[in-house]
């Protein structure tokens, strides 16, 4: 018998095919609170993604954020004090880190904020970002969240709109990159 491990398997429709999704909660490992395996397909590609939760900033998230935000997009201030209090998700494909997201609670707005959402370039357009945010939403829903906020790059706002986020207010610049605040009511 596996100690402190629950497995639930169910089916969900992805890209017009039935795929299996396995959710596993592993309380045995302190760094890995839980993880899920998602299966999706894009054209001829089949990707299996495993999502792990962390209470401290993992090196795999640092790697992804440096690749996407620092090297690719030229941000200089990628890491901040929120990294000290946030919860992190990292998505793995065949054991390699490919996507990440951080989650923190903003008491001033009484809202959970998703941020530093990044998917490595070769994996964009494969629904891995959607799967990662679905898991992030499940995490905050379990904490009785009523709303989620995101400071989105304007070029990615359409992606977030497909997930139910709504633009709020005016665009603003973060490190010379246009952003828009978005919210989703749960």
Task: Give the predicted meaning of each segment.
Residues 46-61:
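A short beta-loop-alpha structural element at the N-terminal edge
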Residues 149-151, 161, 166-181:
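Conserved catalytic-core motifs of GNAT/GCN5-like acyltransferases
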Residues 140-153:
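Conserved GNAT acetyl-CoA-binding A-motif
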Residues 64-76:
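Helix-loop element at the rim of GNAT/NAT acetyltransferase active sites that forms part
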Residues 90, 96-105, 111-118:
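Conserved beta-strand in the GNAT
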Residues 105-115, 124, 174-179:
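A conserved beta-turn-beta hairpin within the catalytic core of GNAT-like acetyltransferases
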Residues 125-138:
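Conserved acetyl-CoA-binding loop-helix of GNAT-fold acetyltransferases
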């Amino acid at each position: 018998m596996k100690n402190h491990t629950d497995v639930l398997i169910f089916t969900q429709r992805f890209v017009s095919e039935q795929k299996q999704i396995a959710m596993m909660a592993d309380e045995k490992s302190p760094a890995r609170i839980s993880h899920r395996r998602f299966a999706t397909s894009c054209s001829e590609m089949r990707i299996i993604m495993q999502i792990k939760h962390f209470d401290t900033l993992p090196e795999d998230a640092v790697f992804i954020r440096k690749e996407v935000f620092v090297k690719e997009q030229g941000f200089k201030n990628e890491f901040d004090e929120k990294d000290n209090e946030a919860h992190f998700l990292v998505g793995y494909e065949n054991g390699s880190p490919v996507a990440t997201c951080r989650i923190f609670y903003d008491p001033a707005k009484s809202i959970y904020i998703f941020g530093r959402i990044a998917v490595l370039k070769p994996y964009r357009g494969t629904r891995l970002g959607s799967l990662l945010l679905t898991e992030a939403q499940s995490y905050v829903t379990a904490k009785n969240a009523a709303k989620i906020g995101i400071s989105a790059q304007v070029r990615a706002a359409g992606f977030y709109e497909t997930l139910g986020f709504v633009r709020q207010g005016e665009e603003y610049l973060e490190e010379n990159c246009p952003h828009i605040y978005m919210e989703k009511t749960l």
